Amino acid sequence: MTSLQHIINRRDWENPITVQVNQVKAHSPLNGFKTIEDARENTQSQKKSLNGQWDFKLFDKPEAVDESLLYEKISKELSGDWQSITVPSNWQLHGFDKPIYCNVKYPFAVNPPFVPSDNPTGCYRTEFTITPEQLTQRNHIIFEGVNSAFHLWCNGQWVGYSQDSRLPSEFDLSELLVVGTNRIAVMVIRWSDGSYLEDQDMWWLSGIFRDVNLLTKPQSQIRDVFITPDLDACYRDATLHIKTAINAPNNYQVAVQIFDGKTSLCEPKIQSTNNKRVDEKGGWSDVVFQTIAIRSPKKWTAETPYLYRCVVSLLDEQGNTVDVEAYNIGFRKVEMLNGQLCVNGKPLLIRGVNRHEHHPENGHAVSTADMIEDIKLMKQNNFNAVRTAHYPNHPLFYELCDELGLYVVDEANIETHGMFPMGRLASDPLWAGAFMSRYTQMVERDKNHASIIIWSLGNECGHGANHDAMYGWSKSFDPSRPVQYEGGGANTTATDIICPMYSRVDTDIKDDAVPKYSIKKWLSLPGETRPLILCEYAHAMGNSLGSFDDYWQAFREYPRLQGGFIWDWVDQGLSKIDENGKHYWAYGGDFGDELNDRQFCINGLLFPDRTPHPSLFEAKYSQQHLQFTLREQNQNQNQNQYSIDVFSDYVFRHTDNEKLVWQLIQNGVCVEQGEMALNIAPQSTHTLTIKTKTAFEHGAQYYLNLDVALINDSHFANANHVMDSEQFKLINSNNLNSKSFASATEKSVISVNETDSHLSIENNTFKLVFNQQSGLIEQWLQDDTQVISSPLVDNFYRAPLDNDIGVSEVDNLDPNAWEARWSRAGIGQWQRTCSSINAVQSSVDVRITCVFNYEFNGVLQAQTQWLYTLNNTGTISLNVDVNLNDTLPPMPRIGLSTTINKQSDTKVNWLGLGPFENYPDRKSAARFGYYSLSLNELYTPYIFPTDNGLRSDCQLLSINNLIVTGAFLFAASEYSQNMLTQAKHTNELIADDCIHVHIDHQHMGVGGDDSWSPSTHKEYLLEQKNYNYSLTLTGGITT
């Protein structure tokens, strides 16, 4: 019997050569069906779940574990500090130990293969029952995921060891089991040498976090099946190659049938072992090779995910069924043709996203419902591909991708981002076995999934001989799929696809170590013929995804630019309640983890609860499959007619479940609508005609809104879900007619009263009082009602976005980041003085001119001149002239701000882009219209508070008693910019009694090519030193 002391002395968890002991060889997932019918219907599997409540006890280190606890019988009453824990789960999320988040750095001293002596060790125990029938068969226990390494005992006997937290660990318990109650004990070690290969940008969490199953199969059994579909040169007829490994006598046979539902497509194909000569010495005695031809099957693609069922049976010498396995299969062929990645002979455009397995309460333990929700949301938002960043996912995820239709890049659980150099272990022969094990076992497990079209060697671990070995094995074992790997420059010999991360569209990035060309340039390099698919791009951290549409213009223009995978899908925030009972999303450092990278795990298109960020709408729009062109407009008094070309970017499917819903918009409001069926062949253009009867009014603005919605429920969305959208501004449209607002009249003479301290302008409907010293409005009344609660002032500052801060690693901030440059220039801290104020009255109006100087550290940074022109209705025409110091960096914003008293029913109404938040470089998806939302609806609760809620291209704003017209951007919030800047979490935000209103002439873009360098494109930077803008402000008078 192997003692615990012997195991500890052996220290498998600090030996890179030992990645497993006594583990069953990797294979495709098995279920052990008894009949063909059960296998076909996927029922009555002989796999039993051991999930549930297990005993748990946490120790400081492996050496502290009491050996007797692993052997003793389990009593019904927990004792000796044992507690109950859910399996699967991460123990840190059940109050044991603490979560740690780091982006690049390891959370321990780097000295491979050694790990800290203080090494939290969780011991698990549970019991299960074995029947007499099961005892006559083979019984394997399968741990689908344990982080990071573990030893296993059964009935007091040591069984084996395993590491690689993201792949199955399977052990044969057959010789150790008894009829009746059996007990297992698991000692899970938080840090192992395997942790050096798992330095992904995610939470470090531990425990048995995926399913545990007991698989019972007969002594003679199927132990592996490898199914490879192929299509003929016309992509019409198919051939299925099936390789079955068995443990059975030589006179046993293997039968294969293909089912479409309950209908068999062929007679059973029966074959004995050793039926194929593989080299000069002969064939395999335990492997059966079979080929089945299928005429004109339906093809699998992400657009048309049609699946068949392949049932493989083991027959004894009498022809009786002994063991059955079954797999969903899709007939599809992946190729590189003419420098493009193709499926079934057609080039793809990858609308991809990187996805971590993350749940805000359960950490890395994700349920079937969680996976289905993610896949459906991806499909609903026009994603067709997912990269399993950066490890093999739960095995069910691939079945769901097969069924619902997503292309998958399956990635090995290898990342050494914190190593110096990054590729240190990739070039070390001592670690070759660990690298190879992680890759080969992934491929062995997942090889039968139609959805997997690309294998990935891992992420951010440099490039070395170990990668070349993995690549070579892959091309030999599974030549049906390409291999990608970004490390070492994205275009090494270990990748079939140029797969850079965060390369720009047109600009090279300087990097002395590896090339970082623009994606357009990369294609034109001498001798380069591979396609380019960005493995990561458009870093969606917080308020981000600016200029995303630029990528999609390039993808559609250059055939070998075949898309990419956005980083990333969901914010990795963990749910937490503060001492006041307020909920917030936690990130690095919030659990006492002193070594952390703060909020860099918060970079998804969705919040942790899967609520969308505004950036998701931009991604959905840019990636949509239908492209619209307004080709012709014919307008007359009785009927208007519009010809619209609709190009379908679908590659394989007709739009046979779509309808076009159109709306005619007048001054932001729908005045006419209709719908029509939309049936377009893939990769073709259909011209449709829309006729409207609304007569155009002079001075009004007209837009045509187009939405393509589902007619019936689909396998991923309900009827009426909108997949594609567009808006066209129609001819004869003008900006909102200024005559809609009250103009000057000859009634009510304006009086101007001036003292040393104040300047007052008023009549019987309004009153405006300026402070002579500050030059600011102290009081503005309209019909005895207060319009604003604080002065109108210049505003140049925004609460820094993550992209402004340039955060990647807390101890490695970019000194050239926008926030750092703004801070050095004192933006947001300037001292304002009024150098002059004067008023001139005419017969029809009063003009007040105020000049303001802004200083920082005794240096003049800016000067502004405000010219107010007041007529006798109280309407203010405001002109602002801004002159900036030539030494200033590009500004965050140019505009003004004020506050307004909050009312219980405050609604913000505007005519401009909406309804969701949009910024100058992220507004393609937004539509021009008239919107009315509450303050809460305007607010985007970014986990790390920043500037938010902007609406662009506005012409009208109405909040309580304030009305603004002109051309501007605005934001209205219960939180000040200072509060947003100071807060680190949303629970720290305290709503003010007032509304903070920001009216911007110009606002800098959000950027988003990455989040650690100044990535806002030049056309969205405020680099000018002189600005002039005009607005009209009224105190609630409209007609």
From Swiss-Prot:
Active-site residues from the entry: E460 (proton donor), E536 (nucleophile)
Keywords, comma-separated and alphabetical: Glycosidase, Hydrolase, Magnesium, Metal-binding, Sodium
Pfam family, one: Glyco_hydro_2_C
Catalytic activity: Hydrolysis of terminal non-reducing beta-D-galactose residues in beta-D-galactosides
Positions bound to Na(+): D201, F600, N603
EC nos: 3.2.1.23
Temperature-dependent activity: Optimum temperature is 4 degrees Celsius. It does not grow at temperatures higher than 25 degrees Celsius.
Sequence positions that bind Mg(2+) 1: E415, H417, E460
Binding positions for substrate per the UniProt entry: N103, D201, E460, E536, Y537, A538, H539, N603, W1012
Gene3D superfamilies xref list: 2.70.98.10, Galactose-binding domain-like, Glycosidases, Immunoglobulins
Binding site for Mg(2+) 2: N596
GO terms under cellular component: beta-galactosidase complex
Record site feature (Important for ensuring that an appropriate proportion of lactose is converted to allolactose), residues: W1012
GO MF entries: beta-galactosidase activity; carbohydrate binding; magnesium ion binding
GO BP term, example: lactose catabolic process
NCBIfam families found in the cross-reference section: PRK09525.1 (NF007074)
Family in the record: Belongs to the glycosyl hydrolase 2 family.
The protein's assembly and partners: Homotetramer.
Protein name: Beta-galactosidase
The organism of origin for this protein: Pseudoalteromonas haloplanktis
